[in-house]
Amino acid sequence: MHGLIVNQLRQFVVRTHGRKLWNRMRADTGVEIAEVPAIDRLYEDADVVALVQAAAAASGADAQVLLEQFGEFLAPALLRIYAPILRPEWRTLDVIQHAEARIHRVVRRQDAQAAPPYLTATRSSADVVEVNYESPRRLCAVARGIMHGLATHFNERLDIQQPTCLLRGDPACRLVGRLIS
């Protein structure tokens, strides 16, 4: 997993549950990740999964809920980092619609080992975006959280339905985001 994501996971855990929990997660799992993970390297997916499971166990939160909250937390950082390649007039649904072409392709070009999820997004109407999410990591909860985080950033409200999900055995997650007026 990309170091930026792991670094943001650390920031999320520290901000929501304290530095002590982050250090305890690292100790309990035996995962060898620095106190502050480097953003310019890749981390083993299994290590990150172990950290998330440890955070869920220690906080008493459901892992999927925790991942969705992390996605919401992550959205503003992603917007700051990728602002130069996003159009200034774009809002929530526009950013979601163009995430694959504008962000994920750039990430893959910059680092051949980076493996962001594959997204296919289409607008079925002015206020609806439909996203197919495919990734062996099966972190659709993070994607949902990012979508909510984008809406919060743009002072919009977004209802997300998920008719299919990798975690339920479907071949892909389908996320349908509808702006609420």
State where each predicted segment sits.
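Long amphipathic alpha-helical segments
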Residues: 22-60
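C-terminal non-catalytic interaction appendages of large macromolecular assemblies
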Residues: 128-181
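Generic solvent-exposed, charged/amphipathic alpha-helical segments
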Residues: 10, 14, 71, 100, ...
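Charged, compositionally biased N-terminal leader segments and the immediate start
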Residues: 1-37
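Amphipathic interaction/junction segments at domain boundaries or subunit interfaces
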Residues: 47-141, 164
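A broad structural signal for alpha-helix termini and local helix breaks/kinks
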Residues: 17, 29, 59, 151-155
